[in-house]
A protein has these predicted regions:
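Targeting-peptide/extracellular-domain and disordered-appendage signature
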Residues: 1-125
Length: 125
């Protein structure tokens, strides 16, 4: 199956990008962001993972404030378009490839919501 990303010169095999180049069920692509305050009283972590060979997309946002943890978790069937980085109220947007990323979590039953933009402080290696 061809996807919108197949128009870009980013292939690593002759197959369409929707075809994973390994049959390993543990193969995945993941996003991970985190931050904390200098005193260690506040921490948050955001993760999203696409398990292409399992057909699963998972996401989470975890906050630790004054020693208490609060969390949102989401999971869905992986969308056919790898560029669809949403799961219910959770979404990642690539504002600038290898640069700025935006993470939003709309109002949901956990009471946690956010609109965060991550800006790199070093080059990608």
């Amino acid at each position: 199956m061809l996807t919108v990303l197949d128009d870009y010169p980013i292939h690593q095999t002759p197959e369409p990008l929707a075809h994973v180049s390994t049959s390993d069920h543990n193969f995945y692509d993941r996003y991970w962001y985190n931050a904390h305050d200098r005193d260690g009283l506040f921490y948050f972590g955001v993760g999203a993972c696409r398990y292409a060979n399992l057909g699963i997309f998972d996401c989470s946002l975890s906050l630790a404030i004054d020693g208490e943890q609060h969390a949102f978790h989401g999971s869905r069937r992986a969308p056919e378009e790898a560029g669809d980085l949403s799961c219910g109220p959770f979404r990642i947007e690539i504002l600038e490839p290898m640069g700025r990323h935006r993470v939003t979590l709309q109002e949901n039953e956990t009471g946690i919501s956010c609109d965060l933009t991550f800006v790199p402080t070093s080059v990608c290696v």
